[in-house]
Curated annotation (Swiss-Prot):
This is Alpha-2-macroglobulin receptor-associated protein. Its main location: endoplasmic reticulum. Transmembrane segments: none annotated. GO terms for cellular component: cell surface; cis-Golgi network; endomembrane system; endoplasmic reticulum; endoplasmic reticulum-Golgi intermediate compartment; endosome; endosome lumen; extracellular region. The modification Phosphoserine is found at residues 50, 135. SUPFAM superfamilies: RAP domain-like (SSF47045). It comes from Homo sapiens (Human). Residues 35-52 have a biased composition (Basic and acidic residues).
Length: 357
């Protein structure tokens, strides 16, 4: 009798209510269950878990992969800044696309190239032999090597010349690492463009291919030429400094700023514009130095945290984690600010050079 009453009762219920009934038991609302008030209300500021660092899911996946690879904290902070820049540029591109812009697909192609560089730079491209290029700041040691016999020879000559103090050798080593990174990015870009052209040749008809090579591919090769020019200028500078030592009248010390200043001097800028750019570069270099300081502090905090965890001091671990998290957040913020400023300065110089052409 009882089962018959139950069946009769169930037939009288609406379909949706039946579905909810059979999905039970329901978690209590106070625990944030699936159907609690908290879960159904919009969340204006969701908690940033490891998988919620970015608005774009593919970038979250890359971030999670990097964490699984246990990259050093400074490298992770650098990657975070690179992914933030990538996300900003991709979201801006989506707005352009909605407005019917980027018809030739060049901006989209540049975004893909930039992402490929990031993947290769941090060893996230799935290649077992991926060379993780160190950033300009701290993580590269002299034991890492420079991957180029010419650079190795120059560096050995500089070290044994007696022309450099310990501080100057550290500065010169950062310049060598910066050059190594530029070469690596050039090679990644070259490989990406080679794959792109192969795809076009295999898929697109010859008539369509001629139009593409006349616009998109041409601009991509222009980018390659600019990077190669920068590499050659950098190598000339390394040769000069390695043989002569540092000049007491040097304008700048940070490798990225030196590159920008060299490009600015050969760009189509008036004396007034060049002087204004020089002043802006001074502020930019100060910003980089501040970022480098926080990177050093983050490395120290990371070592202290590892030591505290190894001895099992709970209170000390708690304090160390708090300081580590604070420095990590600040390093990420400054890294993004530096990269954003660098992108802006590089773009302005590039446009000035194109206007000259």
């Amino acid at each position: 009798m009882a089962p018959r009453r139950v069946r009769s009762f169930l037939r009288g219920l609406p379909a949706l209510l039946l579905l909810l009934l059979f999905l039970g038991p329901w978690p209590a609302a106070s625990h944030g269950g699936k159907y609690s008030r908290e879960k159904n209300q919009p969340k204006p500021s969701p908690k940033r878990e490891s998988g919620e660092e970015f608005r774009m899911e593919k970038l979250n996946q890359l971030w999670e992969k990097a964490q699984r690879l246990h990259l050093p904290p400074v490298r992770l902070a650098e990657l975070h800044a690179d992914l933030k820049i990538q996300e900003r540029d991709e979201l801006a591109w989506k707005k352009l696309k909605l407005d019917g812009l980027d018809e030739d697909g060049e901006k989209e192609a540049r975004l893909i190239r930039n992402l490929n560089v990031i993947l290769a730079k941090y060893g996230l491209d799935g290649k077992k032999d991926a060379r993780q290029v160190t950033s300009n700041s701290l993580s590269g040691t002299q034991e890492d090597g420079l991957d180029d016999p010419r650079l190795e020879k120059l560096w050995h000559k500089a070290k044994t010349s007696g022309k450099f103090s310990g501080e100057e050798l550290d500065k010169l080593w950062r310049e060598f690492l910066h050059h190594k990174e530029k070469v690596h990015e050039y090679n990644v870009l070259l490989e990406t463009l080679s794959r792109t052209e192969e795809i076009h040749e295999n898929v697109i008809s010859p008539s369509d291919l001629s139009d593409i090579k006349g616009s998109v591919l041409h601009s991509r090769h222009t980018e390659l030429k600019e990077k190669l020019r920068s590499i050659n200028q950098g190598l000339d500078r390394l040769r000069r400094v390695s043989h002569q030592g540092y000049s007491t009248e040097a304008e700048f010390e940070e490798p990225r700023v030196i590159d920008l200043w060299d490009l600015a001097q050969s760009a189509n800028l008036t004396d007034k514009e060049l002087e204004a750019f020089r002043e802006e570069l001074k502020h930019f270099e100060a910003k980089i130095e501040k970022h480098n300081h926080y990177q050093k502090q983050l490395e120290i905090a990371h070592e202290k945290l590892r030591h505290a965890e190894s001895v099992g001091d709970g209170e000390r671990v708690s304090r160390s984690r708090e300081k580590h998290a604070l420095l990590e957040g600040r390093t990420k913020e400054l890294g993004y600010t530096v990269k954003k400023h660098l992108q802006d300065l590089s773009g302005r110089i590039s446009r000035a050079r194109h206007n000259e052409l």
